[in-house]
Amino acid sequence: MSSNKINKKSIARIAAIQAIYQHMLRNNDNIDDIIENVLSFYRNDTSMTDSPIKISLTISHFKMLVKLVFENIDKIDEIISNHLVNDKNQNHIPILLQALLRSGICELLFFPDIPTKVIINEYTDIANDMLNDHEIGFVNSILDKIAHENKRFYDK
């Protein structure tokens, strides 16, 4: 019997999106409490006993990603706002899409050791599982533009 596994960093990214989303819904709950809440889900093996897929995450990547998002939230949100068209503001973007973009942009800006193409592909794949087709294209487009603007696209 073979064991299916999902990449631990991929799960860390999904968990980060969950934490960011939770923070946005709860109107600024303590980040450390939210991190622990999300981690408790992944530590609780009984919640996934029927799953044929082994799910675990890179805790250090998850924690660093969430903390960096909130330490740099103004910069990240400004970048998102600068990429909106037709006079839309960030309040018109669904919360889940905002959470995903915040996490992806944070990785592009503050995780230079991770290849840009990996970041863009990972967040596009995650978007594919969570968002509609228009939003998936939006995620891919924004992350690609930000990577080019920050001269990260051809780095690795």
UniProtKB/Swiss-Prot annotation:
Keywords: RNA-binding, Transcription, Transcription antitermination, Transcription regulation. NCBIfam families: nusB. Involved in transcription antitermination. Required for transcription of ribosomal RNA (rRNA) genes. Binds specifically to the boxA antiterminator sequence of the ribosomal RNA (rrn) operons. GO terms for molecular function: RNA binding. This is Transcription antitermination protein NusB. It comes from the Bacteria. GO terms for biological process: DNA-templated transcription termination; transcription antitermination. Belongs to the NusB family. Transmembrane segments: none annotated. The lineage of its organism: Bacteria, Pseudomonadati, Pseudomonadota, Alphaproteobacteria, Rickettsiales. It comes from Rickettsia bellii (strain OSU 85-389). InterPro entries: NusB-like_sf, NusB_fam, NusB_RsmB_TIM44. GO terms for cellular component: cytosol.
